[in-house]
Swiss-Prot record:
InterPro entries: NADH_UbQ_OxRdtase-like_20kDa, NADH_UQ_OxRdtase_20Kd_su. It is a peripheral membrane protein. This is NADH-quinone oxidoreductase subunit B. Coiled coil: none annotated. It comes from Xanthomonas campestris pv. campestris (strain ATCC 33913 / DSM 3586 / NCPPB 528 / LMG 568 / P 25). Belongs to the complex I 20 kDa subunit family. The lineage of its organism: Bacteria, Pseudomonadati, Pseudomonadota, Gammaproteobacteria, Lysobacterales. It comes from the Bacteria. NDH-1 shuttles electrons from NADH, via FMN and iron-sulfur (Fe-S) centers, to quinones in the respiratory chain. Couples the redox reaction to proton translocation (for every two electrons transferred, four hydrogen ions are translocated across the cytoplasmic membrane), and thus conserves the redox energy in a proton gradient.
């Protein structure tokens, strides 16, 4: 089985396996849906909206940014998952850090992260963003962007493929599904 077939199998539903929401049940199994009512929790509704409209702010620093652009192109088309790249941190809720982060760029990364509205998530893409990569022992390289901002998903590779980034985005969608927004 090829990579595309495996991704198609994984990309069908971001809902964790074994979890069924009222809104997703077939008509015969949900008596309220037959009467014209839809029931769900506020958490499920908010998380459904957040997973269906993730707007990443791209922070491309090196060659991994080329693979990030490839993921948004026609072959994989992130738009069908509700992922639309935004140029401004004030309009985005996901930051994709792709490439080598140097000490001089670290304050700018933190500033952009602080400008994003809550809730916000970070995807670290590539070996350089994850832990310094090939330039790990250089004096000017930050050994992982998780020293500057909290990272939710790590995408390994040098550079990671566009399919790996799509898989990381799907993992982030599953993580968002599991979060509880309203304190009980």
């Amino acid at each position: 089985m090829g990579v595309i077939q495996t991704l198609d199998r994984l990309m069908t539903n971001p809902m964790p396996e074994g979890r069924v929401e009222d809104i997703l049940r077939p008509e015969g199994e949900n008596p309220l849906l037959e009467k014209g009512y839809v029931t769900t929790s506020v958490d499920a509704l908010l998380n459904w909206a957040r997973t269906g409209s993730m707007w990443p702010m791209t922070f491309g620093l090196a060659c991994c940014a080329v693979e990030m652009m490839h993921a948004g192109a026609a072959r994989l088309d992130l738009d069908r998952y509700g992922v639309v790249f935004r140029p401004s941190p004030r309009q985005s809720d996901v930051m994709i850090v792709a490439g080598t982060l140097v000490n001089k760029m670290a304050p700018a990364l933190r500033k952009v992260y602080d400008q994003m509205p809550d809730p916000k998530w970070v995807i670290s893409m590539g070996s350089c963003a994850n832990g310094g990569g090939y330039y790990h022992y250089s004096y000017s390289v930050v050994r992982g962007c998780d020293r500057i901002v909290p990272v939710d998903i790590y995408v390994p590779g040098c550079p990671p493929t566009a399919e790996a980034l799509v898989y990381g985005i799907l993992q982030l969608q599953k993580k968002i599904w599991r979060t509880q927004t309203i304190a009980r």
